[in-house]
Amino acid sequence: MDTFTVQDSTAMSWWRNNFWIILAVAIIVVSVGLGLILYCVCKWQLRRGKKWEIAKPLKHKQVDEEKMYENVLNESPVQLPPLPPRNWPSLEDSSPQEAPSQPPATYSLVNKVKNKKTVSIPSYIEPEDDYDDVEIPANTEKASF
């Protein structure tokens, strides 16, 4: 029984050592086999006189492509108005319902105090019953969960 396990482990190590070579050879053999099968099938079909026609695209696809490029190739019959000058206010900035816009307010320079301390108020205050700051006892750190 001992000799069987020794032979089994040496055979397994041989497969493990040559795995990539075996895999490459298997891929090549399968590819060549499938290629030969397809070659024989095509040759047999052509001997029988069967002609394969190349599939043509459907006509509605060509019409769609023509429609897609129609506006680019042909000038549109409707004459568009010229573009406004660049410094002209855009329609997005103001809508026609608004009253005439007032000139922007002018601001004066504010003298800043350089050594002034500012106090910041946090926007989020933790609730008192929040358990993030609770200390964990030392004897539970080593326990596995």
From Swiss-Prot:
Q: According to the UniProt entry, which residues carry Phosphoserine?
A: 76
Q: Which domain of life is it from?
A: Eukaryota
Post-translational modification note? Phosphorylated by the Src-family protein tyrosine kinases LYN and SRC. Phosphorylation occurs on tyrosine residues upon MHC-II stimulation. Phosphorylation also occurs on tyrosine residues after activation of CLEC7A/DECTIN1 by particulate beta-glucan. Lipopolysaccharide (LPS) induces phosphorylation of Tyr-69, Tyr-107 and Tyr-131 differentially to allow temporal recruitment of effector proteins GRB2, CSK and BLNK. Phosphorylation of Tyr-69 is immediately induced by LPS stimulation and allows GRB2 to bind.
State any GO BP term from the record: cellular response to molecule of fungal origin
- Annotated region Disordered: the residues are 74-107
* Compartments, record wording: Cell membrane; Cytoplasmic vesicle, Phagosome; Cell projection, Ruffle; Cell projection, Filopodium
Which membrane topology term applies here? Single-pass membrane protein; Lipid-anchor
Sorted alphabetically, which InterPro entries does this protein's record hold? Immune_Signaling-Apoptosis_Reg (IPR052133), SCIMP (IPR028181)
Q: In which tissues is it expressed?
A: Expressed in antigen-presenting cells, like peripheral blood leukocytes and monocyte-derived dendritic cells (MDDC) (at protein level). Highly expressed in lymph nodes and spleen. Expressed in antigen-presenting cells. Faintly expressed in the majority of nonimmune system tissues.
Write out the ranges of the annotated region (Proline-rich region necessary for constitutive interaction with LYN): 81-86
- Region called Interaction with TLR4, residue ranges: 104-145
Q: Where is the lipid attached (S-palmitoyl cysteine)?
A: 40, 42
Membrane-spanning residues:
19-39
Q: Which GO terms describe its molecular function?
A: molecular adaptor activity
User: Mutating residue 69 to F: what's the consequence?
Assistant: Inhibits interaction with GRB2
**What keyword terms does UniProt attach to this protein?**
Cell membrane, Cell projection, Cytoplasmic vesicle, Lipoprotein, Membrane, Palmitate, Phosphoprotein, Transmembrane, Transmembrane helix
**Is Cell cycle among this UniProt entry's keywords?**
no
Role: Lipid tetraspanin-associated transmembrane adapter/mediator that acts as a scaffold for Src-family kinases and other signaling proteins in immune cells. It is involved in major histocompatibility complex class II (MHC-II) signaling transduction in B cells, where it is required in generating the calcium response and enhancing ERK activity upon MHC-II stimulation. In dendritic cells, it is involved in sustaining CLEC7A/DECTIN1 signaling after CLEC7A activation by fungal beta-glucans.
- Annotated PANTHER family: BCL2 INTERACTING MEDIATOR OF CELL DEATH, SLP ADAPTER AND CSK-INTERACTING MEMBRANE PROTEIN
Q: Could you tell me what this protein is called?
A: SLP adapter and CSK-interacting membrane protein
Species in which this protein is naturally found = Homo sapiens
Gene name, Swiss-Prot/TrEMBL: SCIMP
